[in-house]
Amino acid sequence: MRAIAIVLARSSSKRIKNKNIIDFFNKPMLAYPIEVALNSKLFEKVFISSDSMEYVNLAKNYGASFLNLRPKILADDRATTLEVMAYHMEELELKDEDIACCLYGASALLQEKHLKNAFETLNKNQNTDYVFTCSPFSASPYRSFSLENGVQMAFKEHSNTRTQDLKTLYHDAGLLYMGKAQAFKEMRPIFSQNSIALELSPLEVQDIAHFRRFRISQAQIQPFEKRMPVKILCDCFLTSGLGHVRRCEKILSFIEKLGVEASLYLHKQNNISAFLEGVGGNDFLITDSYCLNSKDFYLLKEKAKSLMVIEDTEHAKGFYPKNTKILNFTLNALKHYHHLSKDYQYYLGVGFYPVDARFIYDRPINTENKEVLITLGGSEQKTLKEIVKILENKNVNLHIISPYTPKNPPKNTHYYSPLNPLEFSSLMKSCACAISAAGQTLYELALSQTPSLILPIASNQIIQSKEFESLGIFKQTSLKTLAKDFENLQIQKNQAWAKNLVFGDKLEGALREFLEI
C-alpha cells in the first residue's frame, strides 16, 4: 500500500492575491503543509498540484515533488477539490487501496499530530472513505440572522432557546482530507456517513481567505507579540537608487515577523531634524543612508535606545558613536574591514542578507530563450541608453526596469516601472540572463541563479561586484566590453558556488540580539 500527499495550490485566488505563496514568517505559505507532511514520515512523496510554475518551483525548494501542471479547467475557482484529486489519482496510477492525503497550500496551522491521528484513524476503520478535520462554530448558527430587509432570524424556532440547550454544530477545518484512492477516484462525497471527522480546537483552525483572518492566523502561529517602537530611516532620493528602500522593506518585514512593531521612514530631505523630533528614548533605530554625516549619527544615538546602521563600506573609527551596531551583508564583507573596533558590534557578510524566498527557484536551462533583463536602479538613464544601443541588434528582447520610458523606443525593448517583488521575481524568472548594476539586485540574481553581467554604476558597488566575480558567480563588464561579454555569456547553472554560499541564515539572530528579544 502506498501513501502520498498532494498540496493543492492554484495561483488565481481572488480574495487574497497569491495567498498560497504570501510571505508568512519568512516562508511562502505553501511551505508549511509541505514541510509538515514530509516531517511526519507518513508519505512516500509529497506532491505540489498547481497551475503555476512559480508555485511549483517554490514548493520544490521545500521538498515537494512535481506533478504536471493542472489543466486550465481544473485551475479556476469552479473546480472542486474532489475533481482535482480524482484527476491526480489517475495521473499517479494509484491503486484503490492506496492512501492519499489532500492538503491546501494555505494550511499554515497544520501539525504533524493532525496527520498522524488521521492516518491511524483511517487504518483502524477500513470501511471509511475519508478522515478530515472539523471544529465547532464559535457561535451557534442556530442564532444566526441576515440583515436583508431588516433583521431576519435564520432559525426562528430557536429565537428564544437558551444557547446551552442548542445542539453543537461543526464546520470543516480545511486542514486535511485523507482517504482511500478509490474514494477520491469515484469522487465520493467527503461529508457523509462514510467519513470520520476529527475535532480540533478553534485555536488550531483559521480560514485565511480574508486578509483579517490572515492576520489572525499570524497571531495563532506566534502566540505572543513583543511590541516596541522600531524606526527605520533610509535614503529615498532620485540619485540614491532603489536598493536602500528595497532592503529596508525586507528588514522591516523580518522584524514584523518577530512580533515587533516597526515603521519605515523615507529620507528625502537634506537634514534629519523632522525625523529626529519623533525619536524617543525607547526607540530602536536602523538607518540605511549615504547622506547622513557623522554628526547625524551621534544625534540619533543620543536620543534613541539603540542604533544599527546598514553600510556597504567600512567607515573610520569614531564616525559612528560607541555601541553602534554595524550591519553589512556584502559578500565577504569581513575581508574589507581593516580597523575593527571594540566600540562597535559587527554583523558582516551574506549570512545577514534579508532573503526573499520568491527569488529562490530552479532555473531551467533554455538556450533558445532570447529574453534579457536589464536593471540599473532608478537613476542611470545615460548608461541605460548606451546598453540598449549596444544590444538592440543582437536578436534578443530587452526587458528594462526603469521609471522612464523613452519616446519611440526600439521594437525589441519592453519598459517596466519599478515592480513589486512578486512581479520582479516573475520577470527575472522569464529571462535567460541579465545585465545589472552591482546593487541589491545582485543577491536576487544569485539566489535565482540567473546568468548575469555586472556593470557597477557607483563606487560603493565595486567591492561586491569584484567579490561576486572572484567566486565565478557573475562577470563584471563595462560599456566598452559589453558586446563581447554578452556574446560569451553562458546560459548555464553554476552549482559549485550555490552549494557553498548561504544567504540570510544569521539575520534573525542578529535582529533578536539588537532588539533584545
Curated annotation (Swiss-Prot):
Alphabetized Gene3D superfamilies for the sequence: Glycogen Phosphorylase B (3.40.50.2000), Spore Coat Polysaccharide Biosynthesis Protein SpsA, Chain A (3.90.550.10)
Residues the record marks as active site: H244
Span list, region Pseudaminic acid cytidylyltransferase: 1-208
Disulfide bonds: none
EC number: 2.7.7.81, 3.6.1.57
A Pfam family per the record: CTP_transf_3
Keyword vocabulary terms for this entry: Hydrolase, Magnesium, Metal-binding, Multifunctional enzyme, Nucleotidyltransferase, Transferase
CDD domains associated with the record: CMP-NeuAc_Synthase
Annotated GO MF terms: hydrolase activity; metal ion binding; N-acylneuraminate cytidylyltransferase activity
Catalytic function, reaction form: UDP-2,4-diacetamido-2,4,6-trideoxy-beta-L-altrose + H2O = 2,4-diacetamido-2,4,6-trideoxy-beta-L-altrose + UDP + H(+); pseudaminate + CTP = CMP-pseudaminate + diphosphate
Family under the similarity heading: In the N-terminal section; belongs to the CMP-NeuNAc synthase family. In the C-terminal section; belongs to the PseG family.
Assembly: Monomer.
Other noteworthy facts: In publications, PseF (HP_0326A) and PseG (HP_0326B) are separated into 2 separate ORFs. However, these 2 enzymes are fused into a single protein in strain ATCC 700392 / 26695.
NCBIfam families according to UniProt: PseF
Identification of the protein by name: Pseudaminic acid cytidylyltransferase and UDP-2,4-diacetamido-2,4,6-trideoxy-beta-L-altropyranose hydrolase
Lineage: Bacteria, Pseudomonadati, Campylobacterota, Epsilonproteobacteria, Campylobacterales
